[in-house]
Amino acid sequence: MTTLTTTPRADGFHMPAEWAPHSQTWMVWPERPDNWRNGGKPAQAAFTAVAKAIAQFEPVTVCVSAAQYENARARLDDDNIRLVEITTDDAWVRDTGPTFVINGRGEVRGVDWTFNAWGGFDGGLYWPWQRDDQVARKILDIEGCKRYRTEGFVLEGGSIHVDGEGTLITTEECLLNRNRNPHLSREEIEAVLREHLAIDTVIWLPEGLYNDETDGHVDNFCCYVRPGEVLLAWTDDQNDPNYPRCQAAMRVLESVRDAKGRQLIVHKMPIPGPIHASEEECAGVDAAEGSQERSPAVRLAGSYVNFLIVNGGIVAPSFDDPKDAEARAILQQVFPEHRVVMVPGREILLGGGNIHCITQQQPAPQGA
């Protein structure tokens, strides 16, 4: 499909909020043995559960390699789940897939950000990554959507959240990291976001969750639940390394105004754990040069904020944790019109993310 030389804003397109109607959700099948233990089999079971949960609400398309097609097709036995053959490096379609943008005339296009595996050769999580940098374009080709390419501007979809009304939330820890766009200032980064997402206000939280190997993606820490209201991962334990991060984020959220001039309402979501991988789980991950080492000593960045809003539903991770029930209750309270479905998230967390990280919503066309 056509690669445009204009920007979405100039063409009348914007990134809608996640709660806007979807035509489908995209996923990628996990198989990378140096990230997913036991050849990816436990992760495949977890991804299958997520896909089937989403399929209760809307269609799902799963990208899968030729080698895994037959296995994935057998597991994803649901009439609302489609498979397409795409070669990838790993399974994080939130960060490798396109950020879809829409206008009011029934058109859907996609922004294809440059991807460097969360830091390239300065702290990135694997190499090579060029096949993952092609995922967005391949998805846009399949869907027949026109493409905006930000060549040389690195961004992952998990590092941003929007309210659909002109405001974006992100973290300085990620977007201002020297391993993303060191040649650009904060103001220059904001300018790219404004032009490609049609937002007017950027809310900068200092950091994301402790030990988040993506360098503090906001989708694991703070998200919009509706215009003017956010959900923030939270701990009252002053000995938790997340405590100063939560406090710093709250200070920002309480002091800013969004693009519509509103003061934000902040809902708190408890942080599970602390969660650690077991020796057995770490031993199941293949050792490979250039890949992220797994250690039971490292606290995992577990978060209930890492959920996906779908058409009429919320698909959120559970961790076999005492806080699971409270998390479900909070989600049901802030999304009273949605049905909350909790899916075990530990296997996804062991790979470095959770449900929001492994999904990418495609908005439905709006207008005629």
Curated annotation (Swiss-Prot):
Reaction(s) this enzyme catalyzes, per UniProt: agmatine + H2O = N-carbamoylputrescine + NH4(+)
Pfam families: PAD_porph (PF04371)
UniProt keyword Hydrolase present: yes
Transmembrane annotation, as ranges: none
GO biological-process terms attached to the record: putrescine biosynthetic process from arginine
UniProt KW keywords: Hydrolase, Polyamine biosynthesis
Name assigned to this protein: Agmatine deiminase
Major enzyme class: hydrolase
Gene this chain is encoded by: aguA
Associated pathway: Amine and polyamine biosynthesis; putrescine biosynthesis via agmatine pathway; N-carbamoylputrescine from agmatine: step 1/1
Functional summary from the UniProt entry: Mediates the hydrolysis of agmatine into N-carbamoylputrescine in the arginine decarboxylase (ADC) pathway of putrescine biosynthesis, a basic polyamine.
Subunit-level organization: Homodimer.
Translocase found in the keyword field: no
Active site positions, chain numbering: C357
EC numbers on record: 3.5.3.12
A GO MF term: protein-arginine deiminase activity
Similarity comment: family membership: Belongs to the agmatine deiminase family.
